[in-house]
């Protein structure tokens, strides 16, 4: 996927607000907690990787229910 759009992501989440929360949490996991990306990195930043994962259905809203290990 060359470019990720909000519409691509909204097929897998309920609304834009949930999308922001989900992408933020997943990007933090990738950037600071060492989580392995579930899509090819292609030299993208963690936020773009997170959005691509959401658009491809590899990250779901269930992630929001998980407790943070801070």
From Swiss-Prot:
| Database matches in SMART domains | RNA_pol_Rpb6 (SM01409)
What's a BP term from Gene Ontology annotated to this protein?
Answer: DNA-templated transcription
Top-level enzyme category:
transferase
Please give the family membership noted in the entry.
Belongs to the RNA polymerase subunit omega family.
| GO molecular function terms listed in the Swiss-Prot or TrEMBL record | DNA binding; DNA-directed RNA polymerase activity
UniProt name for this protein: DNA-directed RNA polymerase subunit omega
Per the entry, what this protein does is: Promotes RNA polymerase assembly. Latches the N- and C-terminal regions of the beta' subunit thereby facilitating its interaction with the beta and alpha subunits.
């Amino acid at each position: 996927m060359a470019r990720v759009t909000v519409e691509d992501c909204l097929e897998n989440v309920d609304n834009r607000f949930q999308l922001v929360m989900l992408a933020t949490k997943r990007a933090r996991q990738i950037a600071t907690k060492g989580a392995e990306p579930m899509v090819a990195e292609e030299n993208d930043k963690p936020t773009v990787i997170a959005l691509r994962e959401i658009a491809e259905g590899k990250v779901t809203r269930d992630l929001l229910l998980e407790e943070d290990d801070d």
